[in-house]
Amino acid sequence: MCARYQIDINIETIKEIFAEIERRFPGVVMSTGEVYPTDVAPVLTRDGPAPAEWGFKRRDGKGRIINARAETAEEKPTFRNAFRRGRCVVPTTGFFEWTKDKHKIKYLFELPDEQLLYMAGLYEYIDNDLCMVVLTHAANESVAGVHERMPVILTGDQLTLWLNETDEARQIIEMASPPLRKSPV
C-alpha cells in the first residue's frame, strides 16, 4: 500500500511540471512536500500534466480508494475503464511506508542516483474532478522488510509506453520494481 509520497518542489523537472499545470489550469493549488490521500497533486497523462485528487471517491460517499492492485486492476469494475483509457504517471521524489510493529518507524523509499521516482497510476473523472489511484504490486526486496506491497515504479523509458500502449502496460505491471534506497525519517 502507498498512503503517502513526497514531492520536492526544488527538483527542476518537478518545477517544470508544476509550471505547465499552472499554465493549463490557472489558480490550481497543488500539494508539495508530503502528499496525503485527498490532496491535489500533479499527474502526467496522454494529454499532458494535470492536477488530480489522490483517491477515487467511493460510490457510497464514504472515503476514498487510494491504491489499486496491479494484478487485478484491469478486471475490477472500479478500475477497468481507467486501466484501459486512464493510465497516468505520478511524479514523486519518493514514497513513505511504516513498519507494522508496536513502535512504527517511518521510511522514505527513493531511487538511488535518481531525483525522481515515477509511480504508475490510474485516473478518471468523478463528479467533474480528476481523481487518481496508485497501482501497487508485491514488494521487492528493498521494501519487503517494511511492507508487503509497494507502488509500481516506472523507469523513464516506460513512461510513454505506460500512458499509450495497453499491451505494454500489462507487461510493465508484471515486472519487478527496481531496487530502492530506504531511509528512516
Q: For each of these PLM feature ranges, what is it?
A:
Residues 1-185:
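Short linear sequence motif anchored by a di-proline
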